[in-house]
Curated annotation (Swiss-Prot):
BP-aspect Gene Ontology terms: unsaturated fatty acid biosynthetic process
GO CC entries: cytoplasm
Active site: H70
Family membership noted in the UniProt record: Belongs to the thioester dehydratase family. FabA subfamily.
Pathway(s) annotated for this protein in UniProt: Lipid metabolism; fatty acid biosynthesis
Matches recorded under Gene3D superfamilies: Hotdog Thioesterase (3.10.129.10)
PANTHER family, per database record: 3-HYDROXYACYL-[ACYL-CARRIER-PROTEIN] DEHYDRATASE, 3-HYDROXYDECANOYL-[ACYL-CARRIER-PROTEIN] DEHYDRATASE
Source species of the chain: Ectopseudomonas mendocina (strain ymp)
Subunit structure: Homodimer.
A GO term for molecular function: (3R)-hydroxyacyl-[acyl-carrier-protein] dehydratase activity
Annotated protein name in UniProt: 3-hydroxydecanoyl-[acyl-carrier-protein] dehydratase
CDD domains membership: FabA
Amino acid sequence: MTRQNAYTREDLLACSRGELFGPGNAQLPAPNMLMIDRIVHISETGGKHGKGEIVAELDINPDLWFFSCHFEGDPVMPGCLGLDAMWQLVGFYLGWQGNPGRGRALGSGEVKFFGQVLPTAKKVTYNIHIKRTINRSLILGIADGSVSVDGREIYSAEGLRVGLFTSTDSF
C-alpha cells in the first residue's frame, strides 16, 4: 500500500472490506457504523503532541439512520457514535503506519460532551492528536481527540486507546 495523506469515501469503504491494509489487518467498520466520509489529512508529525494527527469529516443529512430512532421527535446523533469514530481513526492511523493486526478499542480517559449533532447540521469534523504509539508485541495507539459540528467543538476525549491484534482468540 502506498501511504497517502488523505483518503476518499471510496478508500475508506475499501478499508472496511479489508482491501486497504491487507487481509487480517486494520479495517474500518462498514456502513452504517462507518462514521467517516473522508480523511482530509493524516500525518506522522504535527498535532498537539507533535507525534501525528488526523483530520476527518462526516457529512450530515437528515436521512442518516440514527436520526429516525435517537430520539423520536428529538433527533440527535448519539454521542457514542462520535466517540467510536475517534477510535476508528486511531485504529486507521495504526494500520496506515503499516502495523499488522485487527483493531479493537481499549478505552479512553475523560470524555466530555458539551454539544450535539442535529439533522440540520452540515458537517462533523474529527481531530485526532496522537500522543504515543507502541510497536512491540502489542501495537497500541494513544491519542486525544475532539468532535466539532459546523466549526464548533462539541465533544472531547483524552487518552483514546486502540490496539491491533494478530489474534483475537483470547480477547
